[in-house]
Swiss-Prot record:
GO terms for cellular component: cell outer membrane; pore complex. GO terms for molecular function: neutral sphingomyelin phosphodiesterase activity; porin activity; transmembrane transporter activity. SUPFAM superfamilies: DNase I-like. The gene is spmT. This is Sphingomyelinase. Disruption phenotype: Cells lacking this gene do not grow on sphingomyelin as a sole carbon source anymore and replicate poorly in macrophages indicating that M.tuberculosis utilizes sphingomyelin during infection. Moreover, deletion of this gene reduces lysis of erythrocytes by twofold compared with wild-type. It is an enzyme of class 3 (hydrolase). Induction: Rv0888 protein levels are increased by 5-fold after contact with erythrocytes for 24 hours, and by 100-fold in the presence of sphingomyelin as the sole carbon source. The keyword Phosphoprotein does not apply. It is a multi-pass membrane protein. The chain crosses the membrane at residues 137-145, 162-168, 172-182, 188-196, 205-213. Residues 1-31 form the signal peptide.
Amino acid sequence: MDYAKRIGQVGALAVVLGVGAAVTTHAIGSAAPTDPSSSSTDSPVDACSPLGGSASSLAAIPGASVPQVGVRQVDPGSIPDDLLNALIDFLAAVRNGLVPIIENRTPVANPQQVSVPEGGTVGPVRFDACDPDGNRMTFAVRERGAPGGPQHGIVTVDQRTASFIYTADPGFVGTDTFSVNVSDDTSLHVHGLAGYLGPFHGHDDVATVTVFVGNTPTDTISGDFSMLTYNIAGLPFPLSSAILPRFFYTKEIGKRLNAYYVANVQEDFAYHQFLIKKSKMPSQTPPEPPTLLWPIGVPFSDGLNTLSEFKVQRLDRQTWYECTSDNCLTLKGFTYSQMRLPGGDTVDVYNLHTNTGGGPTTNANLAQVANYIQQNSAGRAVIVTGDFNARYSDDQSALLQFAQVNGLTDAWVQVEHGPTTPPFAPTCMVGNECELLDKIFYRSGQGVTLQAVSYGNEAPKFFNSKGEPLSDHSPAVVGFHYVADNVAVR
């Protein structure tokens, strides 16, 4: 019996010595949407459970009792109990101290809904958030009128009590929303693989607080947001097509993106850390690891990322089946993710960068996206943005077929030209009349109704002080009005 006990203790020692668990990306879910394990429903209880799990039995390693020639065997019975237990306790303490540092988990923020009388104040209301590792959290809400901030009231955050007070504007009755960014960047720790390859990733989660002013919670929640798509010319300078040095101007692009609710960027290859340096957008997709290994990793990156005031989840990256010539030097493709609106329902968001040149290869890229949408977004609200490298006037253009087969509407066509697609729109860079290579398609779906209410070619807002563009593309923005089911009252 004593010998078996010693074997168990030695086995425990071996288990404790296995300090590292498999490194995982906690910044955002990366399972394919068809993977049953990648449910879009968050599980804050599981996410905030204590480190460790249920106790499991420990057994000796099979074959450990077989002597090896020339190797002295250690009799477990010769190891004093006190020494062995002290060693196990010491190594367990080391492990428990290291894991929260080298394998920290992202905090969890949950959506909230509160009611306040007309012209009244509610609070302090504690934020519904937790940190699985017990790290101190900070809370940030953007100023009134800013994207993601309250539009019809003032929010005051108390970091000490992890709570907020909301004061409604006089005379306003209706629904107001704001996003809260929850961060555990208050101590030295790393969030898995995302943290090792990008020190700014993995610390944050974001949730929406919905405020019903002068009324009770409703079955639906409506609001507005802006969606921008922008090819930021992020190849290493001077390979980039943009005429300006990329370090400084990529940082300037990131700063100016704060004026929008959601931004899908393409060619975010080599300067991602500069792009997010001045960003206030709390939900950001972690770049593919090679993007941080500039310039070696550039050929292995798709350059596609999303920055958002709404929570973005379930990221899936897909590369093109077909490419031609220099298009094959980088892993162009598309991303799929879900954007959570106030009320809890989600929109499927696609961000793409097709092959240049148009024709069969570009059309094959669009067919690949269409097939993916049909398999993974059936019946759901969808927004597709990106650098399509195609115009309606191009020979063999498949843009019309792409829209029709997926039930999508081109927001530029709808807002600027009514229901008719212009066959020969000007290809200028400045002006809403210009047909850009960069497009935004959308459709409504179960639980979410979308309507494009405005379109803008934002090129003048992305010039430097000399009137030079920060990229060789013009960013396009669409203002959306949404009506989403309130899942909290279903």
